[in-house]
Each structure stands twice: as C-alpha cells, then as structure tokens.
From Swiss-Prot:
GO MF entries: ATP binding; phosphoribosylaminoimidazolesuccinocarboxamide synthase activity
Record protein name field: Phosphoribosylaminoimidazole-succinocarboxamide synthase
Species: Geotalea uraniireducens (strain Rf4)
EC number assigned by the record: 6.3.2.6
One GO BP annotation of this record: 'de novo' IMP biosynthetic process
Keywords: ATP-binding, Ligase, Nucleotide-binding, Purine biosynthesis
Reaction(s) this enzyme catalyzes, per UniProt: 5-amino-1-(5-phospho-D-ribosyl)imidazole-4-carboxylate + L-aspartate + ATP = (2S)-2-[5-amino-1-(5-phospho-beta-D-ribosyl)imidazole-4-carboxamido]succinate + ADP + phosphate + 2 H(+)
Gene designation per UniProt: purC
SUPFAM superfamilies: SAICAR synthase-like (SSF56104)
Length: 296
C-alpha cells in the first residue's frame, strides 16, 4: 500500500484551488490536478483518508475518458508525470498515478447528472412528487428500479461545504443557453448509455453518475472526473435486487456507516474506525479492478 496523501504542498507551483478531494495547481497554460486520498460524505471532508483512493479515481477517470473520445473530447493532456512540465518533476513520487495535466477550460455553471436507476435524492424526490427534477416518472417504481429510459437531471454547483441543488432542464437553459444545454444533455445520455453497456459486461451497474463540462478554445469538452466511485453509484450486478438500497463499490458504504451515528452531518466529521477506512478502500480498488482488469 502506498503512502497516504491527504494534502499536497508544492512550494514551486501555484495552488489555484483545494476541493473536497482534488488539489489544483495553475501552471499557466495548463492545470495540474492532483487527486488526494481525502474522502467526503454529506459534503463534509473526513479526517481520515482512504489508502490509494486518489490513484483509483485517476485511473478510472482516464479509462472512461479514453472510452468516450468518439463522443466528446476531454481535458486530459497526459497522466504520465514524465510528460508534465519540468517544475513538476521533483514531486513525481507524490504525483505518480494520481495526477493529470489538463487543458484550462471554462467550466459550465451546472453539474450534469444522469440517472438510469431510481436511488438517492432521486428516490426521495420521486416518493414525494412522483417526479425527479420536473421529469414525471411512471407510478409504482420501487427503490433501485431501473428506469424505462435514463433521465438527465442537472444540478447547481455548490461552493465547498454546501449542497448541490437539483434544478429543472429549463433552469439549466437559463444558466447555460439553449444550444449548450441541449448539446450537453444529449452527450451526457449518450456517454451514460455507452458506459452502462461496458460496465454491465464487467459485472457493474452504473445506477447514476455526474459529469462536468467546460468550453476550451470554443469547443465543448468533458472535464473534472469521469464515472468514478466518487461521482457515481456503482452496484454489483450479481446481487442487484430492486426494492431497497443496494450494496455498492463507492462511498455509499461510508455514508451508510455515518447514518448509524448520532452526527448532524456538519463539520467536524466524526472519527472513522480503521475497519470502515479499510473496507471503503477495498470497495474503491475492487471497482478499478472490475472495470479495467488492473489494480495497483
């Protein structure tokens, strides 16, 4: 197991932002995205990290970005440290396997969620209103049911420590413009359907996932991460049983543990037992191995 990376400190590089999981450095023409082993749940960053999580997320993102190049270009320039600018080389031991050199795109203001199954906040909305983000769904669906067709349900992009909010497609049109909103919706559904079929052949159900897009040199590209256990719900196909929550290869395991505690879901986070940290790490690594055939 490699050394835990909870935060990065590269004095020679300009830190542009620290997100819940990623540290982003501005290299002038490009960005360096370093995926740490931090983990958040309910928008609160835990004190403990998950070993090799940054590696898993980076490798899964790179796998999916490659698979989707026939649908949309992505922001990756390279995931090989040897290709990074000279000033990054001295940090190679930290960067190896968990970092990407990427194009500097202008992010769209909405997050793009696609749901193929009814779960999570979508299930809660459906129980209350019979619809999700203004999309009416058939009556009588059970929790975790497969939807007749995948649905596109955008959300706002929340500031660190606050919650994203589901919005209607019409609201996204107001935020991004009609042409971009429609293009993004169509591409999101196309990516999801392709990924769903690939994952299905590897024993994984992608219940839902979230994408981010940006504009680079006038062109729409996909940015951030791509169908990782942080941005998606991955369920094991062999134990899928609608009618309740599903076991998963993602941080749902951690969320489920936190739900058993007397914790109000605001910072500071409660300490995590070693077993929860270990099992969460195993679930992330299992997702990587199942999808790509390679671990670490």
């Amino acid at each position: 197991m490699s050394k835990l990376v909870l935060t990065t400190d590269f004095p020679d590089l300009k830190l542009a932002a620290r997100g819940k999981v990623r540290d982003i450095y501005d290299l002038g023409e490009t960005l360096l995205i370093v995926t740490t082993d931090r983990i958040s749940a309910f928008d609160v960053i835990m004190n403990e990290g998950i070993p090799d999580k940054g590696y898993v997320l980076t490798q899964i993102s790179a796998f999916w970005f490659r698979q989707m190049e026939d649908i949309i270009p992505n922001h990756i320039i390279s995931t090989e440290v040897k290709d990074f600018p000279a000033e990054c080389q001295k940090y190679a031991d930290v960067l190896e396997g968990r970092s990407m050199l990427v194009k500097k795109a202008k992010p769209l203001p909405a997050e793009c969620i696609v749901r193929g199954y009814i779960s999570g906040s979508g299930w809660k909305d459906y129980q209350a209103t019979g619809s999700v983000c203004g999309i009416t769904l058939p009556a009588g669906l059970k929790e975790s049911d497969r939807l007749p067709e995948p649905i596109f349900t955008p959300s706002t992009k929340a500031e660190l420590g606050t919650h994203d909010e589901n919005i209607s497609f019409e609201k996204m049109v107001d935020m991004c413009g009609k042409d971009i909103a429609e293009k993004v919706r169509d591409i999101t559904l196309k990516i999801y359907k392709k990924a769903r079929d690939i994952a299905d052949g590897k024993g994984i159900i992608i219940a839902d996932t979230k994408f981010e897009y940006g504009i680079y040199e006038g062109e729409l590209i996909i940015i951030d991460e791509c169908m990782t256990p942080d941005s998606s719900r991955f369920w094991p196909k062999d134990s899928y049983q609608p009618g309740g929550p599903q076991p998963s290869f993602d941080k749902q395991f951690l969320r489920d543990y936190l739900e058993t505690l007397d914790w109000d879901k605001t910072a500071p986070a409660p300490p995590l037992p070693e077993e929860i940290v270990r099992k969460t790490g195993e679930k992330y690594m299992e997702a990587l191995v199942k999808l790509t055939g390679k671990g670490k």
